C-alpha cells in the first residue's frame, strides 16, 4: 500500500537550508526528530517509511542526558512525561520472585536502570508524528530501490516506481539500514554482541505492580517483565549465543526457538511463553553495534542506529537519536556545503557516540550469567550496589562526567546572528 500525507511548512529561517529538499528514510524516532528541526530551520523534509503505517510496537525506552534538552526544544517534554509508563524502578528477583536488589527511578540521579523518563516506543513515535505531520510530508508503504548521488542532487527510485530528486538523503532506518547497504561500501559494519532479544506484550497480572522485574536463569537467559501505562505488560526475553542469524528466521520460527530455549527457565516464564503464542507485536533482534569510519558519502548521511547503533545494552539509543538529529539539522542549516555540514555533524557527535558505545568488558556475562553460582554472586553484588549510600557515591563520581558528555549548540541564536 502506498499512501502520502503532505502538509505545508510553517517555519522559515534565513539560512543555507532554505528550500532544500531532504529525503529522510525511516519514521521511527531519529527521522521525525530530524524532520522537525529541518522544517523549523527552513528545509522541505520528506519522511519515507517502508511500513504502510507508523510502527508503534516496541518496548519501554528512555531519554537521557542532553536528549532531554532536545525534547524540551521540541516542546514535547510535557507530553512525554504525561504519557510515560510511571515505572517506579526495577527489582532483581530470583526464581521464587523474591527481590534480591532494587533500584528506584531516583537511583543514580534518575540515570540508572530505570531512567526518570520512561515511555513506550510506540507512544514516542506517535508524539513525534503528531508534532510534525502538519509541517512535513510523510510517505508510507514505500522504500528506496536505488539511490544515485549526482554532483548537484540525489536521484531516488522508489519501490512504487516513483523517481524523485533531492538535495540530500538521510538514512535513519535502523541498525539494518537499507540506505546504508545501498550507498556505503562497508557492507558489514554490525559488530554482534552474541545476544538475542525478543519484545512483546502479554496480559497484565496483579503481581506485575508498578516495578519492572528482572530474572536470570542459567545458560545466559533473562526474563524481564515491565508494566506499561495501557493495562498490559511488556515482556522481554534474551539469551546469549554466538551469532547464528536467528533474526532472519520468520516470526513463527523465532517464537518456537524461544519456547525451546526458555522451556525450563523457571520464575513466571510459563506465563510469558503463554503470552508469546498470541503476541501480535512480537519483535526479535540480534544485539549489535554499528561502527563506521564515516557517516556520510556524497550527499547521503546516516543518523541514529543506521550510523552508530549503540545497542539496547548501552541504554543510549533513543538519546543518540535525539541529539544526532538536532545536531545534524543544525549543521545543515549553518553550512551551504553539505560536505562541511556532515563533517561538523560527525565532529560534534562522534566523541559522544564513542562514549555511548563503550560497553563494560563482559557486560553481557554480567547481565546474563551462565551458572546458578554466577547469578547468585551477581545478585549479591547488585544488592550491595543498591544500598542508598553506594548509589549516592556512584552518582557523585559520575555526575561530572555526564555533564561533560555533550553540549548542544544553540542553533536558533547562531542562525539569527548570521
PLM features per residue range, with description:
Residues 23, 46, 137, 234-236:
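A structural signal for isolated positions on well-ordered beta-strands in alpha/beta enzyme cores
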Residues 23-52, 170-171, 198, 257, ...:
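Conserved mid-domain beta->alpha element of the FAD-binding
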Residues 160, 209-221:
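Mid-domain catalytic core of redox enzymes
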Residues 205, 218-219, 228-233, 239-314, ...:
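FAD/FMN-dependent oxidoreductases across multiple families
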Amino acid at each position: 500500500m502506498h499512501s502520502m500525507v503532505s502538509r505545508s511548512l510553517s517555519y522559515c529561517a534565513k539560512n543555507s537550508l532554505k528550500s532544500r529538499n531532504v529525503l529522510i528514510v525511516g519514521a521511527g524516532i531519529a527521522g521525525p526528530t530530524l524532520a522537525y528541526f529541518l522544517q523549523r530551520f527552513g528545509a522541505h523534509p520528506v519522511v519515507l517509511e517502508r511500513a504502510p503505517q507508523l510502527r508503534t510496537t516496541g518496548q519501554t525506552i528512555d531519554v537521557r542526558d542532553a536528549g532531554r534538552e532536545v525534547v524540551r526544544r521540541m516542546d514535547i517534554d510535557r507530553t512525554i512525561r504525561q504519557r510515560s509508563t510511571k515505572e517506579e524502578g526495577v527489582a532483581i528477583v530470583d526464581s521464587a520472585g523474591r527481590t534480591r536488589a532494587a533500584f528506584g527511578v531516583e537511583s543514580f540521579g534518575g540515570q540508572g536502570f530505570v531512567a526518570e523518563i520512561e515511555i513506550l516506543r510506540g507512544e514516542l513515535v506517535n508524539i513525534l508524528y503528531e508534532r510534525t505531520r502538519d509541517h512535513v510530508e510523510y510517505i508510507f508503504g514505500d522504500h528506496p530501490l536505488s539511490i544515485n548521488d549526482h554532483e548537484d542532487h540525489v536521484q531516488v527510485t522508489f519501490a512504487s516506481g516513483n523517481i524523485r530528486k533531492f538535495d540530500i538523503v538521510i538514512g535513519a532506518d535502523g541498525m539494518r539500514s537499507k540506505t546504508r547497504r545501498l550507498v556505503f561500501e562497508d557492507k558489514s559494519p554490525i559488530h554482534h554482541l552474541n545476544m538475542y532479544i525478543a519484545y512483546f506484550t502479554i496480559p497484565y497480572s496483579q503481581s506485575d505492580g508498578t516495578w519492572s522485574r528482572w530474572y536470570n536463569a542459567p545458560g545466559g537467559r533473562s526474563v524481564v517483565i515491565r508494566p506499561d501505562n495501557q493495562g498490559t505488560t511488556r515482556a522481554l526475553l534474551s539469551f546469549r549465543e554466538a551469532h547464528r542469524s536467528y533474526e532472519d528466521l520468520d516470526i513463527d520460527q523465532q517464537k518456537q526457538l524461544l519456547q525451546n530455549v526458555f522451556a525450563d527457565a523457571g520464575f513466571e516464564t510459563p506465563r510469558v511463553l503463554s503470552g508469546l503464542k498470541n503476541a501480535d507485536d512480537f519483535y526479535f533482534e540480534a544485539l549489535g553495534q554499528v561502527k563506521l569510519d564515516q557517516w556520510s558519502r556524497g550527499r547521503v548521511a546516516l543518523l541514529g542506529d543506521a550510523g552508530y547503533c549503540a545497542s539496547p545494552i548501552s541504554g543510549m539509543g533513543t538519546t543518540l537519536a535525539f541529539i544526532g538529529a538536532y545536531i545534524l539539522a543544525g549543521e545543515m542549516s549553518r553550512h551551504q556545503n553539505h560536505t562541511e555540514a556532515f563533517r561538523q555533524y560527525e565532529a560534534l557527535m562522534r566523541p559522544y557516540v564513542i562514549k555511548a558505545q563503550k560497553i563494560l568488558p563482559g557486560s553481557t556475562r554480567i547481565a546474563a550469567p551462565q551458572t546458578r553460582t554466577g547469578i547468585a554472586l551477581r545478585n549479591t553484588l547488585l544488592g550491595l550496589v543498591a544500598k542508598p549510600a553506594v548509589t549516592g557515591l556512584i552518582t557523585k563520581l559520575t555526575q561530572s562526567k555526564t555533564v561533560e558528555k555533550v553540549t548542544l549548540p544553540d542553533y536558533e541564536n547562531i542562525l539569527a546572528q548570521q
